[in-house]
Amino acid sequence: MSLLLRPYESVFVVFGETGVKCGKNRRMYARKTGEVVELPAKGWEISVSRPLAWPEFTRTEYTETGSLAAPGRLPEFSGTVRYRMQFEARAGRAVLSLGEAYEAVQVWVNGRKAGDAICPPYLFFLEEGMLQDGENELVAEVTNTLAKAHHDNVFDRYWVQEPTGLLGPVKVEYME
């Protein structure tokens, strides 16, 4: 068995009487073709859902990736932020990179689940058939912690808060 992990990555390997169960061979480390589709930072549909409201989302006025914790945006928001974008691409195997995100992420491409990540790297293998020629849809849900909703705690008051949401850059890199 061969195993290659990037920083922060982990896997579970279960040994038993029937052999080793490793799940799908994701081949995330296949060679890149050099073809990249970069998704713009602007033009996203961004919706939010607070923990007790989930799975109901409310659309925001924001349309650009970047920290929603910035002053004048949603600095006290705790919950899930949904990012939706239509983009042009071709069919093929690829890796979707979300760049930076805070914290846990779930991703769908054209309605198919691409995966989950609780820490960087926010990379998702897009199997053959997930991307189609022409218009595609990416949905990424980024969930932060409850720290921002409870920042008035005397112990947390002076801590520097992490960003909220999808910071990017977001890109699709094609694989052989």
Report residues per predicted region.
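Aromatic-lined ligand-binding clefts that engage carbohydrates, nucleic acids, or primary amines
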Residues: 87-110, 138-141
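An acidic-aromatic loop/edge-strand motif
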Residues: 20-81, 128-176
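Surface-exposed loops/turns
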Residues: 5-7, 91, 132-133
